[in-house]
Amino acid sequence: MSENVPDDLQYTRTHEWIRDLGNGQVEIGITDHAQQALGDLVFVEVPQVGRELKAGEACAVVESVKAASDVYSPVSGTVAARNDALGDKPELLNSDPYGQGWLMRVARRSAPADGPFLKATEYAQFVEEAG
């Protein structure tokens, strides 16, 4: 299984990625490893705009032909945008997990309490060691 782990993102041990948008918001999605493990995704449920999230809280659901899995918010804040395209095209999570397959954008409330996050090299090593 060949993993795609972009250097410009941060990662969690629960296989979410975080992209700092530079405007107080972060974009969040699931990693290439997560989408490969789940298989073909058939349903995605993302939180409503305006929902308050706490770091570590289950906030979205991704469902494949094999399993359903919770997605955990890596940060605390307010949902500022959600990727409504996933409602009609959940397969975007499989084909482009770091681009068109983003799940939500969150206006961060308290960056210091978030994390710890992994750098790309640390996440790649974590995935490799986990088998």
Regions found by a protein language model. Name each.
Residues 1-55, 91, 95-131:
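Acidic, low-complexity mobile loops and tails
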Residues 23, 58, 65:
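Short glycine/proline-centered loop/turn elements that form peptide/ligand docking sites
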Residues 48-62, 78-81:
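Short, well-structured beta-strand-loop connectors
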Residues 61-62, 75, 123-128:
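A general structural signal for short secondary-structure boundary/capping elements
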Residues 62-100:
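Mid-chain, well-packed structural core segment of small domains
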